[in-house]
């Protein structure tokens, strides 16, 4: 009798009983995750549509993740744009200065 009780502790309980399989909350959550990933589209992403918008073209050329061209060109364009804006505004203010007969 004592020997039989010692052996019963070595035998694992029924882990895969029907009551434990249907009642596990983790099984439901895992099924939700699997169904979510099954609903996602498969394969490569579709190609971007053609556009004539210069801002979209600039974005696709320099900033889009699939372009693969990391460079300092946008920073250089920003510096040149600020310089050009400053030069044009300075020139216009200088012309207004000559309009009043100064110099």
From Swiss-Prot:
The organelle targeting sequence, given as a residue range: 1-6
Role description: Mitochondrial membrane ATP synthase (F(1)F(0) ATP synthase or Complex V) produces ATP from ADP in the presence of a proton gradient across the membrane which is generated by electron transport complexes of the respiratory chain. F-type ATP synthases consist of two structural domains, F(1) - containing the extramembraneous catalytic core, and F(0) - containing the membrane proton channel, linked together by a central stalk and a peripheral stalk.
Gene Ontology cellular-component terms listed: mitochondrial inner membrane; proton-transporting ATP synthase complex
Record's subcellular location: Mitochondrion inner membrane
Protein's UniProt name: ATP synthase subunit f, mitochondrial
Top-level taxonomic group: Eukaryota
Keyword Cell membrane: no
Listed GO MF terms: ATP hydrolysis activity; proton-transporting ATP synthase activity, rotational mechanism
PANTHER family referenced in this protein's UniProt entry, alphabetically: ATP SYNTHASE SUBUNIT F, MITOCHONDRIAL (PTHR28161:SF1)
Metal-binding keyword on record: no
Predominant location category: mitochondrion
Phylogenetic placement of the source organism: Eukaryota, Fungi, Dikarya, Ascomycota, Saccharomycotina
A matching Pfam family: F1F0-ATPsyn_F
Quaternary structure and partners: F-type ATP synthases have 2 components, the catalytic core F(1) and the membrane-embedded component F(0), linked together by a central stalk and a peripheral stalk. The central stalk, also called rotor shaft, is often seen as part of F(1). The peripheral stalk is seen as part of F(0). F(0) contains the membrane channel next to the rotor. F-type ATP synthases form dimers but each monomer functions independently in ATP generation.
GO biological process: proton motive force-driven ATP synthesis
Family designation: Belongs to the ATPase F chain family.
UniProt entry keywords in alphabetical sequence: ATP synthesis, CF(0), Hydrogen ion transport, Ion transport, Membrane, Mitochondrion, Mitochondrion inner membrane, Transit peptide, Transport
